[in-house]
């Protein structure tokens, strides 16, 4: 594996070519009266979860400290008397939050994350979602690019960005890395460094900040042959998978399967991707993670990076939220 240390400043042409300028964005909505800004999917998730919690209280159900719908990362909302929802509304909110059939430890907000701007606007309108603190009416969601823009040089005519991830530097140096490896494939490179994202509403402690340290490994393979010569060593490893087909059905019930069978049935795209999924599962187990609270979640088609053919997150449930601790991308060739 080759180590590479790349610049944090990236010329605009690089990120325009990679698609980041056009697509690296979240949906943002604004309070018409106060001008307060919200990330639309997080706001919708927050309001629906609070309404479900209020419904449980109205029905006399106890909300324990470990209840997955309990709100630990949200904006402050004025305490109101519990309001009971009709059963159809509860079922609708559960589908939006992908809680149907879920393991109680593995509730997530995947459905909300997958919604388009028009879909978020429809929910905000239909469910009368407003500013939680003031009750102000919200404008329709608009895309907000998450990259920090800057001008390079004294004349300011060269546009650039602070890198949103460390991968682009490795791609730009691919030819040099290949030459250093005597033009042999496959090979890998690794980079550790600061990345920057202009988050709409940074919250969740250190999990969503505008400047953070990240580590990325790029394993370069021949696109005509994505087999891995050590795949046999891990093909019997059993992992918990949440494939996109299950998510499409509105469920978060994980499937236990071996890496070998997952690759054979094409749930996982290829052997190389499967090999590294197995290795990270074994690594998390070795460092002491409770594996009943770990899963691999496959990105939905409209959720995947525009350059990916398959993508899985290793998600680890913590006492705070369920963040992805690692992401595996099989990039288009």
Over which residues does each language-model region extend?
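TRNA-recognition modules of translation machinery and tRNA-sensing kinases, especially anticodon-binding
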Residues: 1-333
């Amino acid at each position: 594996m080759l180590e590479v240390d790349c610049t944090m400043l990236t010329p605009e042409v690089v990120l325009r070519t990679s698609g980041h300028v056009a697509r690296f964005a979240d949906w943002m909505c604004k309070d018409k009266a106060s001008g307060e800004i919200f990330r639309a999917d997080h706001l919708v998730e927050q309001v629906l979860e609070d309404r479900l919690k209020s419904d449980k209280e109205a029905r006399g159900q106890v909300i324990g400290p470990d209840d997955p719908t309990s709100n630990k990362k949200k904006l402050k909302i004025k305490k109101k008397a519990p309001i009971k929802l009709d059963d159809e509304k509860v079922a609708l909110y559960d589908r939006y939050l992908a809680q149907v059939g879920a393991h109680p430890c593995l509730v997530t907000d995947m459905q909300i994350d997958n919604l388009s701007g028009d879909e978020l606007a429809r929910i905000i309108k239909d469910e009368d979602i407003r500013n939680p603190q003031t009750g102000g009416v919200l404008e329709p969601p608009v895309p907000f690019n998450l990259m920090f823009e800057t001008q390079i040089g004294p004349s300011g005519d060269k546009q650039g960005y602070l890198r949103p991830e460390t991968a682009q530097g490795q791609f730009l140096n691919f030819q040099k890395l290949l030459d250093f490896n005597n033009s042999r494939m496959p090979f890998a490179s690794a980079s550790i460094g600061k990345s920057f994202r202009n988050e709409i509403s940074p919250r969740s402690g250190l999990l969503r900040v505008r400047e953070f340290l990240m580590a990325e490994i790029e394993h370069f393979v021949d696109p005509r042959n994505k087999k891995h010569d050590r795949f046999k060593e891990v093909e019997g490893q059993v992992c918990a998978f949440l494939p996109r087909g299950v998510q499409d059905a509105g469920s978060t019930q994980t499937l236990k399967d071996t890496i070998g069978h997952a690759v054979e049935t094409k749930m996982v795209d290829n052997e190389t991707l499967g090999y590294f999924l197995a290795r990270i599962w074994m690594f998390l187990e070795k460092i002491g993670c409770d594996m009943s609270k770990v899963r691999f979640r496959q990105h939905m088609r409209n959720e995947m990076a525009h350059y990916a053919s398959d993508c899985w997150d290793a998600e680890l449930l913590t006492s705070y939220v369920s963040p992805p601790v690692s992401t595996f991308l099989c990039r288009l060739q």
